Amino acid sequence: MEYTISKINKIGVKIKESIALNSDEQEMFNYFRKIHELIFEKFYKKVNLSDKYTIVTRLKRMESIINKLQRPNSSKLSRIDDIAGIRIIVNNFNEIYEVSELLEKLLIGNNCQLKYNKDYIKSPKKDGYRSLHKIFTFNYENKNLNFEIQIRTKLQHLWSTTVEIYDLIEYKNLKSGSFNKLKTWEGLFFKRCSKVMENFEKEDFISSKKLVNKIFT
């Protein structure tokens, strides 16, 4: 199917404004999402990591794309970074940056470039989220498709997954909500747990113990 970036972005505007798409627009929207699967094929051809790492790929759900477009100050549809997402789970801090460097060596080339990094390891989000995000762009039929690779430790992944599960069980929105999460007891609890895990990974057991005592007393 032929598509242009201009048409894709117009579809994104209609979605943002909650205007129904016609059948041709819906088909183009579906196609634009679907072609991002090509990135996974290219990734596995170029990248062969050790079995000690866990690698997971996912294509962003249609509902999640729509929700992202309808947020305040959202990106254009063609510029969304994580329609194609790859997550690599490693064992410790050092491996995060080792894998990061290796990915750049293996992926960057004629049709793939690194756009930027978001280092939430060195600068965690206010809610305690920690991970290294690498945003790449892949050229397909003279059009750029963005994709995101997240690299995190097992403990960081445990924290993030626990937040998601809590959201599902309690019908909360701690993961992606735009409200001040730290004004809720749950948000403050998970932030402190993240700090405990960070100290533990840095082998700062004294600080970890003090913070655990603060959380549970």
Predicted regions and their residues:
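Surface-exposed, low-hydrophobicity interaction/linker segments
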Residues: 24-71
